[in-house]
Amino acid sequence: MIRAVTRAVRAAVRPARAAAPLASTSASARRPAGAREISALATRENILRAAIAVFAEHGFSGARVEKISTAAGSVDRMIYYYFGNKEGLFVAALEEIYRRFNAAEAGLALNEAEPVESLRAVIGFALDYYRKHPEFINLLNSENLHRGVHTARSPRLREYSSPAIGVIARLLRSGVAKGVFRADVAARDLYLLIAAAGYFYQGNRFTLSAFLGENLESPAARAHWESFVKDMVMRAIAA
């Protein structure tokens, strides 16, 4: 009799014990999913970071997928998984360097009530950014050698140009309202003037140093150029 009762109790308890791990298994399955998403994002970011460095050093044509995956501490198939192919990765790298530029510029403490000083700050920022981020110049040089075929495939680059030009447009409007800037200057033209002055100097600093017989990378030479560009821009747009 006692044995029969004991067996009945064990039979009743057994399903409950078996059911308990189901809830635990379900919860643990949810947790790794979030961890996998974080890991996937980190893998993609590592690949993109490595790609920018490798493309900057070797250009699009010279960069090899296996070199990028090795630099990222990953494997080739992950590049194809996240970016499709080397071309897709290069487009993503170009988008990323523009995104970084905009993010850095957005951190400037600009006062639209002081358009002259704020515009001078924008010019100084642009020239300094080109100097501190040679990968920006190098990737654009490589893309221009390919006649912009990769940037043409990106739907985001036009989106990234809007904030950069928008900063200048707001300062121009403020300056016009205060009577210190001409009203017939387009923000696009001013953006091109500033970008050209910074890009050309940084992108050609080695050959120009040899051609001119002076070190254009010296602090004194850079300070002189920045002062000259600021003065040139202000004279061009002064009312």
PLM segments and residue spans:
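Amphipathic alpha-helical segments used for helix-helix packing
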Residues: 132-155, 204-212
